[in-house]
């Protein structure tokens, strides 16, 4: 409650009290009489000093108008005295015998209205207080005041609110393009309806926290040009039974009155959680609310013109009935940005801030792999706060570097005092991590190593990937195991006993090894089997109270395989440190003197360290002998072998406005329909142009004679076999060309990397949390065509009347240079998984020091 509201309430109470006092004052006709004792009034009656008298029987008082005032009445001639009910006859006799000129007796009787008011008024006051308290508990009761418990709390955005557009969104270009189509459908429905297209009824934005799901919804609100209602999923859950379902009904009734419109439900997992039996046979109020939401989204009634946009970071717990097409037709993953996205986000958040021209934002974008947009905004803000703390005027490279360390590891513990021996142990511990990682061939080089205490760690070593990756091989995971055990091995090698500082390293190594055995099938003994399926009661978090789906013998073998992996990594780390003991001592000496070493320093110190061979102890394929035949080469590698120049990616995708000439074929491009005859259409009906080849090196496609031998038995056939020679038609979001060798592109609307379905054994530390939420989605891979080359740049001439979401040249770029690029074969679309010893760093691998806490 603010100060203005308090002042208003106090003033209202004061006015009411003043009115009551004024009413009682002016309605009292005895205010001119002096109240005296009963004995004084009787003495005046006995002295016959009374001119007139009036007896008020109900009030049991007598009014006397005296002939002369005296000392007993303080000179007043109008006096008032009270008397008991038993003395009424005596007072009447006294007045009658006083010889007054006149006297009167008034008997006041209550009216029926007064009696009713005296009975009802206290009840009205009590009910008023009750409803006031309930109104305060319900936050105003929503629409309808006190009786509006069942009314919707959805708020309609007005023109006075700050407007966010798609130009303010950076690092989520695919999500922007998907949502822009909805905005274009609302503003230009004719060209979609001419093709029989229907607008998506629901759009689900899912992904980890801080990636911009709510920001995308605000951008849709600023661009749509239709009524926009926003509500939180928790607003449906109240203390009364049935309130949630009633609010859902009222929200959609409100939306129908403003159709066409958009409803945005933030954190829909609060109401859309998967239904279950309930514990103890009880009733869950969320189920009733969810059932009403399902009916309103796609039930018997009409819902034309209402688009529901929802956001969640827990798609795995949503009810399958809520995710089916017809309710949420489009499910858009919003993951962590890639390198180009991080560049754009840093440009947006650094706009308007005095950044030093020598500050390397490009390098900062490379060092922050896996960070979300919120993390990057926090990095820039922390750098500004650090600069202000030091009374600086320009944000320098050092401030940006320190801000990254603060966001990843926490603030420095400058006041911590440690002994020289503990400092030496920390130096060797972090040096062991660094040297082990430097000698392994399948791990990113160490970017920074420090023994400064930060957050809950006594030191850490960071590895930064050179580029974004979405896959991890077995040798890479073993290399991370070796790095994790490097600190423990250094303590045992130098000080002949381990310390508690390696607890977080052991925890990280155990997680990696167990994931290799149980999730990724990287154990030759147990095979490619997933042990420990996710499931269980949704009310128990899907993991509590659920028995393992494997036997005790398998559990014992899993433990043995995990231990063997960690022991092999421990032995390898010991061998590396023992072989390069001089380099380990040199790293420890430099850390004791300088406390922090960067990659440039490490390159000088570890110049003589050679890469170790890959560990093959666990590469047991059984009777399956790997082939010596190398994999096929990419179109880029083939072009380089032929001496041709591979074209650089274009600066931006081609966005052609409706009605523009030659909208189906870009200028200077060669129409390509896969060698099939032209049917007369200017372009594909889905709005995506066929890929074009740079001239004059476009390949000539020649038919392949005969049918290739696929190794099927003679005379054997099946539906769809043998495969057709002609390529299958493409689908929206797919590339028309495929990699030589038949690697399938990613299906549309399917997330890659960390928050999508893994491809070809992609590691997933928490695959269920941000996996594909809809189990019924299918991929439609494209059949490779012989002779087809991968295009240099995917070309999307989407015909939007206003030029599309990327028509603004200054979008996400304060300098005015348009650097947005659609993904290419050389530009991965997803960030690599985090390689962190404690599994809490958002961007880099951190191997903590021996402080005993992590």
From Swiss-Prot:
Question: What does the record give as EC number?
Answer: 3.4.24.-
Q: Where in the cell is it found?
A: Cell membrane
Membrane topology field: Multi-pass membrane protein
Residue ranges, compositional bias (Pro residues): 720-730, 825-834
Q: Which UniProt keywords apply?
A: ATP-binding, Cell membrane, Hydrolase, Membrane, Metal-binding, Metalloprotease, Nucleotide-binding, Protease, Transmembrane, Transmembrane helix, Zinc
Instruction: Tell me its cofactors.
Output: Zn(2+)
Q: One GO CC annotation, please? A: plasma membrane
Compositional bias per record (Low complexity), positions renumbered to this chain? 661-692, 698-719, 749-778
Write out the topological domains of type Cytoplasmic. Answer: 1-5, 134-854
**Active site annotation, chain numbering:** 430
Q: Where are the transmembrane segments?
A: 6-26, 113-133
Function summary: Acts as a processive, ATP-dependent zinc metallopeptidase for both cytoplasmic and membrane proteins. Plays a role in the quality control of integral membrane proteins.
Report the protein name in the record. ATP-dependent zinc metalloprotease FtsH
């Amino acid at each position: 409650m603010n100060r203005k509201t308090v002042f208003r309430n106090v003033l209202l109470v004061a006015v009411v009290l003043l009115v009551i006092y004024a009413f009682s004052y002016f309605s009292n006709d005895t205010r001119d009489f002096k109240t005296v004792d009963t004995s004084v009034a009787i003495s005046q009656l006995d002295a016959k000093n009374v001119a007139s008298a009036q007896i008020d029987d109900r009030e049991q008082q007598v009014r006397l108008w005296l002939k002369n005032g005296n000392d007993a009445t303080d000179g007043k001639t109008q006096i008032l005295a009270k008397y008991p009910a038993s003395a009424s006859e005596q007072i009447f006799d006294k007045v009658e015998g006083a010889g007054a000129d006149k006297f009167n007796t008034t008997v006041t009787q209550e009216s029926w209205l007064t009696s009713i008011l005296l009975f009802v008024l206290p009840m009205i006051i009590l009910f008023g207080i009750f409803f006031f308290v309930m109104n305060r508990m319900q936050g105003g009761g929503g629409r309808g005041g006190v009786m509006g418990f069942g009314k919707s709390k959805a708020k309609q955005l007005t023109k006075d609110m700050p407007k966010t557009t798609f130009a303010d969104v950076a690092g989520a270009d695919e999500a922007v393009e998907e949502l822009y189509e909805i905005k274009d459908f609302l503003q230009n429905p004719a060209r979609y309806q001419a093709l029989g297209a229907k607008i998506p009824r629901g759009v689900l934005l899912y992904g980890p926290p801080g990636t911009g799901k709510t920001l995308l919804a605000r951008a849709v609100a600023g661009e749509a040009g239709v009524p926009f209602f926003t509500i939180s999923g928790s607003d449906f859950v109240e203390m009364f039974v049935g309130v949630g379902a009633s609010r859902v009904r009222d929200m959609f009734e409100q939306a129908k009155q403003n159709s066409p419109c958009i409803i945005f439900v933030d954190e829909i997992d609060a109401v859309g959680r998967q239904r279950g039996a309930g514990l103890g046979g009880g009733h869950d109020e969320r189920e009733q609310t969810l059932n009403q939401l399902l009916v309103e989204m796609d039930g018997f009634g009409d819902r034309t013109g209402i688009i529901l946009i929802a956001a969640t970071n827990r798609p795995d717990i949503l009810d399958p009935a809520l995710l089916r097409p017809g309710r949420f037709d489009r499910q858009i993953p919003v993951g962590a940005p890639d390198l180009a996205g991080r560049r754009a986000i840093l440009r947006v958040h650094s706009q308007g801030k005095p950044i030093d021209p020598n500050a390397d934002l490009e390098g900062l974008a490379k060092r922050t792999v896996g960070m979300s947009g919120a993390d990057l905004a926090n990095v820039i803000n922390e750098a500004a706060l650090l600069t202000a703390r030091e009374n600086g005027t320009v944000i320098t490279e050092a401030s940006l570097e320190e801000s990254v360390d603060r966001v990843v590891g926490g603030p420095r513990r400058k006041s911590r005092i440690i002994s020289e021996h503990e400092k030496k142990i920390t130096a060797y511990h972090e040096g062991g991590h660094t040297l082990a990682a430097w000698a392994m061939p399948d791990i990113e080089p160490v970017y920074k190593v420090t023994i400064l205490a930060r957050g809950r760690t006594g030191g850490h070593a960071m590895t930064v990937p050179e580029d974004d990756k979405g896959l991890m091989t077995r040798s890479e995971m073993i290399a991370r195991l070796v790095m994790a055990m490097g600190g423990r091995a250094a303590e045992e090698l130098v000080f002949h006993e381990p310390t508690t500082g390696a607890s977080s390293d052991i925890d990280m190594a155990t997680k990696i090894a167990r994931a290799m055995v149980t999730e990724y099938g990287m154990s030759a003994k147990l095979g490619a089997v997933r042990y420990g399926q996710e499931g269980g009661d949704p009310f128990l978090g899907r993991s509590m109270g659920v028995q393992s789906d494997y036997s005790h013998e398998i559990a014992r073998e899993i433990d043995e395989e995990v231990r063997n992996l960690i022991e092999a990594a421990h032995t390898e780390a010991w061998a590396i440190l023992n072989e390069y003991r001089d380099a380990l001592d040199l790293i420890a000496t430099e850390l004791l003197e300088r406390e922090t070493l960067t990659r440039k320093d490490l390159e000088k110190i570890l110049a003589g360290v050679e890469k170790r061979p890959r560990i093959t102890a666990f590469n047991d394929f059984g009777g399956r002998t790997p082939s010596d035949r190398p994999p096929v080469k990419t179109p880029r590698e083939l072009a380089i072998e032929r001496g041709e120049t591979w074209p650089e990616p274009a600066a931006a995708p081609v966005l052609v406005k409706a009605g523009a000439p030659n909208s189906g074929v870009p200028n200077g491009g060669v129409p390509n329909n896969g060698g099939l005859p032209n049917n007369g259409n200017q372009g594909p009906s889905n709005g995506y142009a066929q890929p074009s080849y740079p001239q004059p090196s476009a390949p000539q496609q020649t038919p392949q004679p005969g049918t290739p031998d696929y190794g099927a038995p003679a005379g054997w056939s099946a539906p769809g076999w043998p495969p057709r020679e002609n390529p299958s038609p493409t689908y929206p979001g797919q590339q028309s060309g495929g990699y030589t060798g038949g690697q399938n592109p990613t299906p549309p609307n399917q997330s890659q990397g960390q928050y999508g379905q893994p491809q070809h054994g992609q590691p997933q530390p928490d695959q269920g949390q941000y996996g594909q939420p809809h189990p019924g989605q299918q991929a439609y891979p494209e059949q490779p065509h012989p002779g087809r080359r991968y295009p240099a740049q995917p070309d999307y001439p989407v015909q939007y009347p206003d030029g599309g979401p990327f028509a603004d040249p200054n979008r996400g770029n304060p300098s005015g240079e348009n650097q947005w690029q659609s993904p290419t074969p050389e530009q991965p679309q997803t960030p690599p998984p985090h390689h962190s010893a404690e599994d809490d760093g958002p961007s880099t691998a951190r191997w903590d020091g021996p402080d005993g806490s992590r």
